[in-house]
Amino acid sequence: MSLLTEVETPIKNEWGCRCNDSSDPLVVAASIIGILHLILWILDRLFFKCIYRFFEHGLKRGPSTEGVPESMREEYRKEQQSAVDADDSHFVSIELE
């Protein structure tokens, strides 16, 4: 019996389940999806720093420079640094006393 589809109702002095043990494919699929969703949510909350740090650094790696002459690599680095320097002006520095 699936915990996700169970309906409990008071019967006399006991708690009983009004649903029958369904082997309906839709109920089975919904149960599996629900359990997987719960597992993924728990893992996300436990390891969110590791997961998002990996994606953040993975996206910032930039294009491969294999086979590119050193002069072009240096030019690319300067362009990237100037873009970063230009973006620094958008941040506000707040100092607390």
From Swiss-Prot:
Residues 44-97 are intravirion. The chain crosses the membrane at residues 23-43. GO terms for biological process: protein complex oligomerization; symbiont genome entry into host cell via pore formation in plasma membrane; symbiont-mediated suppression of host autophagy. GO terms for molecular function: monoatomic ion channel activity; proton transmembrane transporter activity. The M2 protein from most influenza A strains is inhibited by amantadine and rimantadine, resulting in viral uncoating incapacity. Emergence of amantadine-resistant variants is usually rapid. The record marks 41 as: Seems to be involved in pH gating. When the channel is activated, one or more imidazole moieties of His-37 probably become bi-protonated. Forms a proton-selective ion channel that is necessary for the efficient release of the viral genome during virus entry. After attaching to the cell surface, the virion enters the cell by endocytosis. Acidification of the endosome triggers M2 ion channel activity. Homotetramer; composed of two disulfide-linked dimers held together by non-covalent interactions. May interact with matrix protein 1. This is Matrix protein 2. It comes from Influenza A virus (strain A/Memphis/1/1971 H3N2). The lineage of its organism: Viruses, Riboviria, Orthornavirae, Negarnaviricota, Polyploviricotina. The gene is M.
